[in-house]
Amino acid sequence: MASLSSQSKLLATPYSFPYHTKPSRVSLRRVSCKASNDNKDKPNDQEKTFSIDRRNMLIGLGGLYGASNVFPSNQSTLAAPIQPPVLPDSCHPPEDLAEGVNVLCCPPDVKDPIDFQMPSNPSRLRIRPAAHLADPTYIEKYKKALAAMKALPQNDPRSFYQQANIHCAYCNGAYDQVGFPDVNIQVHHSWLFLPFHRWYLYFYERILGSLIDDPTFAIPFWNWDAPKGMHMPHMFIDPNSPLYDAKRNPAHFPDTIVDLDFSSGEAPSHNPRQIGNNLSIMYKQVVRAKKARLFHGRPLQAGSFPDESGDGSLEGTPHGNIHLWSGDPRQSNFENMGNFYSAGRDPLFYAHHANVDRMWYIWKNSLGRKDYKKKDWLNAGFLLFDENAQPVRVYVRDALDERKLGYAYQEVDIPWINSKPKPRKANPWPNRLRSKATTTTKLINKFPLTLDSTVSFEVKRPKKSRSKSEKEDEEEVLVIEKIKHEPQFPLKFDVYINDEDEDPSAADQTEFAGSFVNVPHFHRHGDKKDKRQTTNLSIGISEVLDELDVDGDDSIVVTLVPRVGSGQITIGGAKIEFVRDEED
């Protein structure tokens, strides 16, 4: 192995990620669903054909998911878990990339894959430290490990080049789903988000430790959810360090406070309430996400396009906002952190996602929440490379307990758990009759709509005045449906409930319920005629309605405010759902 000093000299120049010519590829046309309300329950002939073809294909995946397991009586189509891709056949250059971006994300074809074996109970856990609390000895160790990773040949699956490409491949349509050559694997915008990234960081960490012969080495987490960690960690900003990346927003270097509600294009925040706003956002996105579907995201099964799912609460905000806050606005596609194809090229990415992973730990252990129990989630799988350059098939079921994987997080304060937002006004819009008599807000009543200005609309509530036990059993959820947009652009709109003032409520106020955030990415579309992505936004609102004292109302007024990409988003509708812990 080269010495640390020689590696540091090697890394003084930017790490190279060459571009490649993108070959053409034929893709089958996606069967799209009817968008209008009149036809929502009437599949057309193409949809029926797709349902039959998908059913036959799933039966062909094997006896493990035979008809008795994947033909629920209340579903018209089969379900089965996403399977690990098969190399090299399942991988190809990403499609629908932005002009001038031609990348090759596929890993080298080196060995036959093996199934992951859970390690025996470790005698000593790897402890991931908060980045801002790391001591100089640890920082030097991390620099040495990453320098060694960057010094590996680019065709080595353990190299930083190949590790960065993992995110590119899984997040930009480079992998086909097993059995569905016209449907890509996408690990964002669904229940795959948290377990995939946990596995990704697990092997990244193991490789780093092996390169410095230290099995106890653990990567740091960017503690952006606590006041003293709400800035880009200093260990990542030395231009002469392997932890540095030149493609970041220079206006956001320390000690600029991170904005967890960041809208792309905004100037650095100097809001004296910024820290309080950040803590309130963390409360909304983690504490209020009481059910697995809200926290993890909607299901995604084999044969389904990612368009048919939806983000969990953590993925949009703060995860997406931090990607955009860190990315370089001087780059055409907000590289590196600001675009999924390039995010893994920045060492800051792994510290960011370590804290995202930590949120999963907190959600389960500090808040007592429950993961999905669906087999299609537990048996979903991915293909990654271990510290021996061995391709390994891994499954969600083995990633549920980080301690069994041999690591834990440094214990630090979690101030946002008690940072509940407060209403701007007591009992706003107390009932439908009074709201109509007192507000000057014009309510729209026609969908779909193009979100090119602030809009408000009424959403009926199927149930009201529920008991405490009913609310604990079922979370009331506001669903913004059929959000259509082009995924290669940064986008954001905010959602407010019963916010009657012309100026929207602040992030630390109850009326501000949440946001839709899109980090630029590229993925294959089944329908080549429509390049837009379709998704859904789900927000738990039981606690919000209690705090606003409107749980007895027949309806709520929802206001959408475009922040980034005005006019580039179409909204298909909105409704109220009730979500339980288990959705088998």
From Swiss-Prot:
<dbReference type="GO" id="GO:0004097">
    <property type="term" value="F:catechol oxidase activity"/>
</dbReference>
<dbReference type="InterPro" id="IPR050316">
    <property type="entry name" value="Tyrosinase/Hemocyanin"/>
</dbReference>
<dbReference type="InterPro" id="IPR016213">
    <property type="entry name" value="Polyphenol_oxidase"/>
</dbReference>
<dbReference type="InterPro" id="IPR002227">
    <property type="entry name" value="Tyrosinase_Cu-bd"/>
</dbReference>
<dbReference type="InterPro" id="IPR022739">
    <property type="entry name" value="Polyphenol_oxidase_cen"/>
</dbReference>
<feature type="transit peptide" description="Chloroplast">
    <location>
        <begin position="1"/>
        <end position="32"/>
    </location>
</feature>
<feature type="disulfide bond">
    <location>
        <begin position="105"/>
        <end position="168"/>
    </location>
</feature>
<feature type="binding site">
    <location>
        <position position="188"/>
    </location>
    <ligand>
        <name>Cu cation A</name>
    </ligand>
</feature>
<feature type="binding site">
    <location>
        <position position="319"/>
    </location>
    <ligand>
        <name>Cu cation B</name>
    </ligand>
</feature>
<keyword id="KW-0934">Plastid</keyword>
<keyword id="KW-0186">Copper</keyword>
<feature type="propeptide" description="Removed in mature form">
    <location>
        <begin position="432"/>
        <end position="584"/>
    </location>
</feature>
<dbReference type="GO" id="GO:1901709">
    <property type="term" value="P:(+)-larreatricin metabolic process"/>
</dbReference>
<dbReference type="Pfam" id="PF12142">
    <property type="entry name" value="PPO1_DWL"/>
</dbReference>
<dbReference type="GO" id="GO:0046872">
    <property type="term" value="F:metal ion binding"/>
</dbReference>
<feature type="binding site">
    <location>
        <position position="197"/>
    </location>
    <ligand>
        <name>Cu cation A</name>
    </ligand>
</feature>
<dbReference type="GO" id="GO:0009543">
    <property type="term" value="C:chloroplast thylakoid lumen"/>
</dbReference>
<keyword id="KW-0809">Transit peptide</keyword>
<dbReference type="InterPro" id="IPR022740">
    <property type="entry name" value="Polyphenol_oxidase_C"/>
</dbReference>
<keyword id="KW-0560">Oxidoreductase</keyword>
<keyword id="KW-1015">Disulfide bond</keyword>
<keyword id="KW-0479">Metal-binding</keyword>
<comment type="function">
    <text>Enantio-specific polyphenol oxidase involved in aromatic ring hydroxylation. Involved in the biosynthesis of the creosote bush 8-8' linked lignans. Has a strong preference for the 3' position of (+)-larreatricin.</text>
</comment>
<feature type="binding site">
    <location>
        <position position="323"/>
    </location>
    <ligand>
        <name>Cu cation B</name>
    </ligand>
</feature>
<keyword id="KW-0150">Chloroplast</keyword>
<dbReference type="Pfam" id="PF12143">
    <property type="entry name" value="PPO1_KFDV"/>
</dbReference>
<dbReference type="Pfam" id="PF00264">
    <property type="entry name" value="Tyrosinase"/>
</dbReference>
<dbReference type="GO" id="GO:0046148">
    <property type="term" value="P:pigment biosynthetic process"/>
</dbReference>
<protein>
    <recommendedName>
        <fullName>(+)-larreatricin hydroxylase, chloroplastic</fullName>
        <ecNumber>1.14.99.47</ecNumber>
    </recommendedName>
</protein>
<dbReference type="InterPro" id="IPR008922">
    <property type="entry name" value="Di-copper_centre_dom_sf"/>
</dbReference>
<keyword id="KW-0883">Thioether bond</keyword>
<dbReference type="GO" id="GO:1901708">
    <property type="term" value="P:(+)-3'-hydroxylarreatricin biosynthetic process"/>
</dbReference>
<feature type="binding site">
    <location>
        <position position="353"/>
    </location>
    <ligand>
        <name>Cu cation B</name>
    </ligand>
</feature>
<feature type="transit peptide" description="Thylakoid">
    <location>
        <begin position="33"/>
        <end position="79"/>
    </location>
</feature>
<keyword id="KW-0793">Thylakoid</keyword>
<feature type="binding site">
    <location>
        <position position="167"/>
    </location>
    <ligand>
        <name>Cu cation A</name>
    </ligand>
</feature>
<feature type="disulfide bond">
    <location>
        <begin position="91"/>
        <end position="106"/>
    </location>
</feature>
<comment type="similarity">
    <text>Belongs to the tyrosinase family.</text>
</comment>
<feature type="cross-link" description="2'-(S-cysteinyl)-histidine (Cys-His)">
    <location>
        <begin position="171"/>
        <end position="188"/>
    </location>
</feature>
